[in-house]
Amino acid sequence: MELKEYLDYLVEFIKETVKKANAKGVVIGISGGIDSAVVACLAKKAFPNDYTAVWMPIESSDEDYKCKQELIDQCGIKAIDVELKETFLSFKKAIKDSTTPEHKLAIANAKARLRMTTLYTVAQTNSYLVLGTDNLDEWHIGYFTKFGDGGVDMVPLVHLLKREVREAARILGVPTSIINRAPTASLWEDQTDESELGITYDQIDAYLAGEINDENVKSRVDHLHKISEHKRNGAVAPKEFKRK
C-alpha cells in the first residue's frame, strides 16, 4: 500500500472510531513537532467542522511557538490556546512543599500529564475523542509519558516509522520548518529526543524495518522495549478471586 493511500485510510479510521464511540469529533494537542502536525492535518480531513487543536504552552520554546503558528497559518488548522505555565508552577511548588524529593524527569513528565488532563476536559466538553501522536518508533521503545501523551483514545500513527511520518508530513503540506526540525519532547531547555535516547530515529527505523543487524542498536532498542512494556499494557491485575 502506498503511503498516500494509507493516509486516506487513517482518515476513515478516525471517522469510524469516533462513530463507534458515539462521539462527534476529535481533539489533538499540538506542540510544534512533526507528529502532532501530521495528526492535526488528519483530524482536519476527518472532521473539518468538528475538531480542535490545542496549544498548551508550559515553558515552551520560541521555536515551539513559531512552528505551531506556521502549522496553523499554512495548513489552516483550527486551534485554541490553554496557557498551563502557572498551573504547572503551582503543581511543582506543591510537590516541593510536600518534601517529596525533586526528580527532573518526573517533574518534566507532569507537563505531559497536565496536557492530557486539559485535552480530556476539552474532549468531554465537546463529545470528542483524544487523538494521540505516537509513531511506531516511539511506541515500540516506550518514548511517551504514561497517562500523559500516552493517555489517548487512538493512535493513528502507531504503525508508521519516523521516516514515514516525515513523508506523510510532506504529502499533507506540513511546513518544512517542522519537517526539518530536530525531534524534541520539549521536556526541558535544549532537550532533543535522540540525545536523551542515546540512539537516532534513523537507527530505530532501520532496525524495525529489518534493514540492519547492528548489535549495539539491537541491544538498545530491545532494552528500551522491554523496560517500557508496562506503558503499552493496561493496569496489572492479580489472579481472579474464586468465590465459594
Swiss-Prot record:
Binding site for ATP: G29, I30, S31, G32, G33, I34, D35, S36, T133, K162, T184
UniProt keyword annotations, A-Z: ATP-binding, Ligase, Magnesium, Metal-binding, NAD, Nucleotide-binding
Pfam hit, one: NAD_synthase
Pathway assignment: Cofactor biosynthesis; NAD(+) biosynthesis; NAD(+) from deamido-NAD(+) (ammonia route): step 1/1
Top EC class of this enzyme: ligase
Transmembrane segments: none
Binding site for Mg(2+): D35, E138
Amino-acid positions noted as binding deamido-NAD(+) in the UniProt annotation, renumbered to this chain: R113, K146, D153, H230, K231
Annotated GO biological process: NAD biosynthetic process
InterPro entries named in the record: NAD/GMP_synthase, NAD_synthase, NH(3)-dep_NAD(+)_synth, Rossmann-like_a/b/a_fold
Domain of life: Bacteria
Keyword Oxidoreductase: no
GO MF annotation list: ATP binding; glutaminase activity; metal ion binding; NAD+ synthase (glutamine-hydrolyzing) activity; NAD+ synthase activity
PANTHER family (UniProt xref): NH 3 /GLUTAMINE-DEPENDENT NAD + SYNTHETASE, NH(3)-DEPENDENT NAD(+) SYNTHETASE
Summary of the function given for this chain in its UniProt record: Catalyzes the ATP-dependent amidation of deamido-NAD to form NAD. Uses ammonia as a nitrogen source.
HAMAP family reported for this sequence: NadE_ammonia_dep
Record text on subunit structure and interactions: Homodimer.
Name of the protein in its database record: NH(3)-dependent NAD(+) synthetase
